[in-house]
């Protein structure tokens, strides 16, 4: 058992959501933050692993219960787009590792607008054909492909980022209108 401030934490085998709520509680007490101190919130609403994102949304809803906050909601692909530090004239393919045998791919315009729907692709010739098109690439799925010899050509098409960072919200301005309510969570990608 470890004690920090007035809260005592016991070693536990809770899921990540319990540990996250304890860390959030400790941070709020140490930094003396209340909902009144926060005027807007940047929120990734998926798609992602549903349990993780659902738990994070539940914690945020509880924290802001009874308090108004402006919410800027981003899909995971838009979050990656915020990490771009140069402009391009080509459309972008954001490639997300689904932690299965496929990858989720979303097309974006050079301005970061989503084009069409998310599609999942097996790592095969159909994916090679798609990635050979006139696109620049970003997303964490690139790490999986870089290890495969048949995909060595993608190194020339990378424009980053290949990992998500929360400071992308600080570094870039993206044309989003704030909402007053928490958005619906986008369910995970459909498996192939």
Q: How would you describe each model-predicted region?
A:
Residues 4-47:
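N-terminal beta-alpha supersecondary unit
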Residues 4-6, 17, 72-192:
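Oxyanion-binding and handling regions
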Residues 19-22, 58, 79:
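Short amphipathic alpha-helical face segments that pack within enzyme cores
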Residues 24, 59, 145-147:
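Generic structural signal for hydrophobic residues
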Residues 25-26, 65, 171-172:
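Short glycine/serine- and small hydrophobic-enriched flexible loop segments
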Residues 40-76:
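DPxDG-like acidic metal-binding loop motif
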């Amino acid at each position: 058992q470890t004690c920090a401030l007035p809260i005592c934490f016991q070693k536990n085998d809770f899921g990540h959501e319990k540990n996250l709520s304890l860390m959030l509680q400790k941070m709020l007490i140490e930094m003396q933050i209340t909902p009144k101190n926060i005027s807007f919130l940047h929120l990734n609403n998926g798609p992602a692993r549903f349990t993780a994102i659902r738990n994070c949304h539940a914690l945020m809803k509880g924290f802001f219960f009874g308090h108004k906050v402006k919410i800027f909601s981003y899909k995971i692909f838009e979050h990656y787009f915020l990490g771009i530090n140069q402009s391009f004239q080509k459309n972008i393919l954001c490639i997300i590792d689904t932690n299965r045998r496929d990858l989720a791919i979303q097309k974006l315009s050079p301005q970061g607008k989503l084009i069409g729907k998310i599609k999942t692709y097996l790592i095969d010739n159909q994916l090679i054909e798609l990635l050979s098109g006139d696109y620049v690439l970003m997303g964490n799925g690139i790490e999986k492909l870089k290890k495969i010899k048949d995909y060595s050509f993608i190194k020339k098409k990378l424009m980053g980022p290949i990992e998500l960072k929360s400071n992308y919200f600080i570094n870039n301005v993206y044309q989003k209108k704030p909402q007053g309510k928490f958005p619906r969570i986008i369910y995970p990608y459909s498996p192939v």
